[in-house]
Amino acid sequence: MQNLQPFHTFSLPVQAQKIIEITDIEQLKQQWAACQTNKLPVLLLGQGSNVLFLRDFQGVVLLNRLMGIQHTQDADFHYLHVNGGENWHQLVAWSIQQGIFGLENLALIPGCAGSAPIQNIGAYGVEFKDVCDYVEVLNLHTNEIFRLSNEQCQFGYRDSIFKHAYATGYVIIAVGLKLSKNWIPVLKYGSLANLEKSAVNAQQIFDEVCAIRRSKLPDPAEFGNAGSFFKNPVISKVDFDHLQQEYPDIPHFPQADGRVKLAAGWLIDQCGLKGYQLGGAAVHQQQALVLINQQDATSSDVVELAHHIRQKVAQRFAVWLQPEVRFIDEDGEVDSEQAIC
């Protein structure tokens, strides 16, 4: 067995039978085929920033280290072809240095470019789907490489086709980004709204987003974590109206389909759970949406804490939180909501 602790940001004491860095597509095909022949579970992992290992993984972990960025342009757009192993935050920083704008709101989101479409990562009013041109996929069953358009990816809130029809036996080897040269800053959320739209530049937004995230979110090098543990729940307008009568100050964000998104961190905070500790796992003091490895936490500590939070929020608000983090059991991914029921 090999130590998985350095390869996931929760930094839990788990192992895998074997861990292999993948640097080219032929190697990826060969390693996948070998796992199939030997009937071994296989897990494709980027930087492990959005996973919770429930137990030792009884198979092979393939680390996506496919690197490289290609930049082309026309009169109206910049086009970036980014291989899946590239670090997302470093890509955002690089793009601004190159005078390519539009990714700045997504600064400091952990993980690889190849993981970004799976969750449809988003922050401060921008989601991956807003900048995605295509996603390049390898079908490991047939060794065919194909591209899915933005529409074909079926992006939703922290959701995509890569969590469903293309969840198993497919790997994102590259993403295509399309960024307008007619840059318009997105300043909807938080302290970004205080910036002057007519004078602000992308570097200032990048710096502000980094400052906000660093002030609210723990550094995984200090306290292991996987960022936002729960999704922000989206509820019906009727249910929201009932809640607002009881909690007039409840933060909320109307959605295009008429439903209303709530702030999961606020719900957890209202239950008095900031700083709450169970075993070695705890709710972060600054951001209740983040669960941390406070001190030598085990996987079961994190699961029990998540269960406790979910129950408390449901008892108070009649809203059931869903994990945003992917749960990995000994032979592969499992339903995260079921795991904490």
Curated annotation (Swiss-Prot):
EC class of the enzyme, as a word: oxidoreductase
| Cellular component aspect of the GO annotation | cytosol
Metabolic or biological pathway: Cell wall biogenesis; peptidoglycan biosynthesis
Every copy of the FAD-binding PCMH-type domain together lies at: 12-182
Instruction: Write out the GO biological process terms.
Output: cell division; cell wall organization; peptidoglycan biosynthetic process; regulation of cell shape
GO MF annotation terms: FAD binding; UDP-N-acetylmuramate dehydrogenase activity
Tell me its cofactors. FAD
- According to its UniProt record, where is this protein located? Cytoplasm
Please list the residues that make up the active site: R158, S228 (proton donor), E324
Q: Which InterPro entries match?
A: FAD-bd_PCMH, FAD-bd_PCMH-like_sf, FAD-bd_PCMH_sub1, FAD-bd_PCMH_sub2, MurB, MurB_C, MurB_C_sf, Oxid_FAD_bind_N
Q: Which reaction does it catalyse?
A: UDP-N-acetyl-alpha-D-muramate + NADP(+) = UDP-N-acetyl-3-O-(1-carboxyvinyl)-alpha-D-glucosamine + NADPH + H(+)
Keywords assigned by UniProt, alphabetized: Cell cycle, Cell division, Cell shape, Cell wall biogenesis/degradation, Cytoplasm, FAD, Flavoprotein, NADP, Oxidoreductase, Peptidoglycan synthesis
Taxonomically, which superkingdom? Bacteria
Which range is the signal sequence, renumbered to this chain? none
What's its EC?
A: 1.3.1.98
**Could you confirm whether the keyword Magnesium appears in this record?**
no
- Record-stated family: Belongs to the MurB family.
What job does the chain carry out? Answer: Cell wall formation.
User: NCBIfam families, per this entry?
Assistant: murB, PRK00046.1, PRK13903.1
**Protein's name in the database:** UDP-N-acetylenolpyruvoylglucosamine reductase
Query: Which lineage is the organism of this entry classified under, starting from the top rank?
Result: Bacteria, Pseudomonadati, Pseudomonadota, Gammaproteobacteria, Pasteurellales
Its gene name is murB
